[in-house]
A protein has these predicted regions:
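Short, surface-exposed beta-strand-loop junctions and turns on beta-sheet-rich folds
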Residues: 42-44, 63, 125-127
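Short active-site oxyanion
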Residues: 31-35
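C-terminal edge-of-domain segments
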Residues: 101-152
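A short, well-structured catalytic beta-strand-centered motif of the EAL phosphodiesterase domain
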Residues: 24-28
Length: 152
């Protein structure tokens, strides 16, 4: 997912329960989850710490009928700076955004460790759609019933 969907839109809730979105780059993934960065002074950081949950959607493709969309909803944990250097080295453009040790000291790493998701691929015929879960989360099937011969 990271290579196909690097920049995603993440949503958290503010203090009033309203959704707030922001664009975030997925820095890496492994068997533990998806890793991303934020600065400790941002409102996004405060919402992650308070709620511990987010939703993200990433889209890849040239036009509507060639697009793949992935949505993930899950729990997040702060890892801190323990793997920050590895993530920055893997995504070296981040050194241009945060060029000094001082500026990088504001960064912290989070990972999405448990959740559900959906893969939706309009480039395939018939359209490919499936649900997945990770981090020992129970699978939540998506879709709906239309008729015995048609499900979406």
């Amino acid at each position: 997912m990271k290579s196909a969907l690097h920049t995603v839109i993440m949503a958290t809730n503010d203090d009033n329960g309203n959704p707030v979105t922001c664009a975030v780059d997925i820095m890496d993934y492994d068997e533990n989850g998806l890793y991303f960065l934020t600065a400790k002074g941002k409102n996004f950081y405060s919402r992650l710490k308070k709620n511990g949950y987010l939703s993200l959607t990433g889209i890849n493709g040239e036009d509507t009928m060639s697009r793949v969309a992935v949505t993930v909803c899950g729990k997040v944990k702060e890892v801190g700076s323990e793997c920050l250097k590895r993530l920055l080295d893997k995504n070296s453009y981040m050194y241009e955004i945060y060029p000094t040790e001082c500026s990088r000291s504001a960064l912290t790493v989070f990972y999405i460790y448990k959740g559900n998701g959906e893969w939706f691929d309009l480039s395939k015929k018939p359209i490919e759609r499936y649900s997945f879960s990770f981090g020992s989360e129970d699978l939540k099937e998506v879709g709906y019933f239309i008729t015995d011969k048609c499900n979406a």
